[in-house]
């Protein structure tokens, strides 16, 4: 938090129920208080004499700018939206009732071609405002003009991690590198990873250049992966491999990463994600609207593959609501497996908070802890 002069604030939250993670990475709720000093949580624990807390922490008592009585309500980590196209607020409900390829190529791409560095800004501000209404405090974005979104997010005080969405219709590895350097220097709230849109929009030469960039900067790589049956089928026809197997062979994942959607995996795909500890980001509402399918969350969890949850863009979702995504992720997994106990509620909550933070490389923002 910052005050009206742009200075970081010291805030004490007390009389709160606080959602924390225990040593088994399971959620616990404690009664107590939470202190924020500047931009860092410095205490989470029982309520007691502040002087006693400061003695234990070997610190001077902060001069509080605000002391907030939470009145027994819950303090919890912000949701981490692990896949988004925030700027697509202007395409909400523009193209309903279409499968992915028609929706993308005939409806979305032509409209997106009209975007520029100025008209995209209010679209992104609108998306950030909507994120905050459902407690989303960070987005993992694939968007046009990444330096612009970094500026917008920083001005809003919103944390934004971006990944390159380059494809063979436009852009180049050189532009990806330029964006990587610019965004990572914009603000402490913004960062950028190497990636590309998808195998089906990207030629082999560009994919190899992206892999080379990932090695140069030791960056994780993310892309849309195995979202539809047709995507996997066509990749097999082109290369004799699934998108996961192809990108693994190209050396994309030496420094981690993952995929968005991950609906249609074969055994070898699961093996690669498990071995590399890649994150599968599920986007249930988007996959329903475009009739793409239901991701195999139970198997991801059983095989120890990290999972996070994303809304995807508002054009393929129609809202940016993590509560809706959590419900759908849970309910669809139960129906897919015909097993009401296949994934617990706290596991889904973990995916929407800690799982997303880990996917974005935000290990210091994954829980409420000092």
Residues of each region from the PLM?
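N-terminal metal-binding scaffold of metallo-dependent hydrolase/deaminase domains
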Residues: 6-58
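Histidine/acidic-residue-rich catalytic or RNA/ligand-binding cores of hydrolases
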Residues: 173, 229-241, 269-273, 291-300, ...
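Acidic, glycine-enriched loop/beta-strand segments at the rims
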Residues: 19-31, 290-291, 297, 357-370
């Amino acid at each position: 938090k910052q005050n009206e002069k742009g200075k970081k604030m010291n805030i004490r939250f007390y009389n709160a129920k606080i959602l924390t993670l225990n040593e088994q990475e399971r959620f616990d709720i404690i009664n107590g208080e939470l202190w924020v000093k500047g931009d860092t949580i410095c205490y989470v624990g029982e309520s007691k004499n502040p002087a006693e807390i400061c003695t234990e922490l070997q610190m001077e008592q902060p001069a509080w700018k605000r002391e907030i009585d939470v009145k027994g309500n819950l303090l919890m980590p912000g949701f981490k939206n692990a896949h988004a196209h925030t700027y697509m607020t202007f395409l909400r409900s523009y193209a309903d009732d279409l499968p992915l390829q028609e929706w993308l190529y005939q409806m979305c791409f032509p409209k997106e071609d009209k975007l520029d560095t100025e008209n995209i800004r209010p679209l992104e501000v609108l998306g950030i405002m909507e994120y905050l209404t459902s407690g989303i405090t960070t987005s993992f974005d694939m968007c046009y003009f990444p330096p612009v979104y970094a500026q917008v997010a920083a001005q809003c005080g919103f944390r934004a991690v971006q990944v390159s969405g380059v494809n063979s219709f436009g852009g180049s590895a050189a532009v990806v590198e330029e964006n990587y350097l610019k965004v990572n220097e914009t603000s402490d709230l913004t960062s950028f990873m190497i990636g590309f849109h998808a195998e089906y929009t990207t030629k082999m030469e560009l994919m190899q250049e992206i892999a080379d960039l990932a090695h140069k900067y030791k960056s994780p790589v993310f892309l849309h992966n195995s979202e539809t049956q047709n995507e996997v089928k066509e990749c097999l026809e082109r290369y004799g491999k699934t998108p996961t197997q192809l990108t693994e062979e190209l050396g994309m994942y030496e420094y981690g990463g993952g995929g968005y959607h991950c609906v249609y995996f074969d055994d070898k795909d699961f093996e690669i994600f498990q071995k590399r500890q890649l994150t599968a980001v599920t986007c249930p509402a988007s996959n329903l609207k475009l009739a793409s399918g239901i991701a195999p969350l139970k198997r991801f969890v059983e095989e120890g593959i990290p999972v996070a949850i994303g809304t995807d863009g508002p054009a393929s979702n129609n809202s940016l609501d993590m509560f809706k995504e959590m419900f759908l992720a849970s309910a669809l997994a139960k129906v897919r497996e015909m097993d009401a106990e296949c994934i617990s509620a706290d596991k889904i909550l973990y995916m929407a908070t800690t799982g997303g933070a880990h996917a974005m490389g935000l290990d210091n923002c994954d829980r409420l802890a000092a």
